[in-house]
């Protein structure tokens, strides 16, 4: 657990307020808008996730941000679902969250660490991310389906 000025970051899923995270992703995010709850839950189970809290997780904390990393634990990691609730922005909390993710001991060996962003390039550049070569990455985008 990491603590700073009344805020905390935890990777313990027992601390996460899944309702807050899901509502933000489902209702507010541009990248996961409309994600079904069961797929959201499945994604948490298979990721290294970081919850950002005001207060002490497990006691009096409120979930105010989140990020998760999808990784094979050896060569590749993908940072995704990063957010800080609007009323907590402008306090350096997103920077601290990303700093914590990048410094996590389980994420030090991956050669490739990627992400996608529409509007936070400056934040991620502080930690070494650079735009990918044009045309290098490809993807398939499908509509959400229920998990089986």
Please identify what each model-predicted range represents.
Residues 1-35, 135, 148:
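Short amphipathic alpha-helix that is part of the acyltransferase structural core
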Residues 38-83:
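A conserved beta-strand-loop-helix scaffold within acyl/acetyltransferase catalytic domains
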Residues 55-58, 87-88, 141-144:
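Short loop segments at secondary-structure junctions
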Residues 88-97:
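Conserved acetyl-CoA pyrophosphate-binding loop and the N-cap/start of the following alpha-helix
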Residues 95, 107-143:
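Conserved active-site alpha-helix within GNAT-family acetyltransferase domains
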């Amino acid at each position: 657990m990491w603590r700073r000025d009344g805020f905390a970051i935890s990777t313990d899923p027992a601390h996460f307020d899944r309702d807050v995270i899901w509502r933000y992703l489902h209702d507010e995010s541009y990248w996961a808008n409309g994600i079904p709850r069961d797929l959201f839950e499945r994604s948490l189970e298979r990721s290294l996730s970081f919850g950002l809290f005001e207060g002490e997780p497990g006691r009096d904390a409120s979930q105010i941000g989140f990020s998760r990393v999808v990784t094979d634990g050896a060569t590749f990691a993908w940072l995704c679902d990063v957010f800080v609730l609007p009323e907590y922005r402008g306090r350096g909390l997103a920077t601290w969250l990303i700093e914590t993710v990048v410094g996590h001991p389980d994420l030090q060996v991956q050669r490739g660490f990627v992400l996608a962003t529409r509007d936070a390039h400056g934040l991620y550049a502080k930690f070494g991310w650079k735009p990918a070569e044009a045309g290098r990455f490809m993807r398939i985008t499908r509509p959400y389906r229920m998990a089986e």
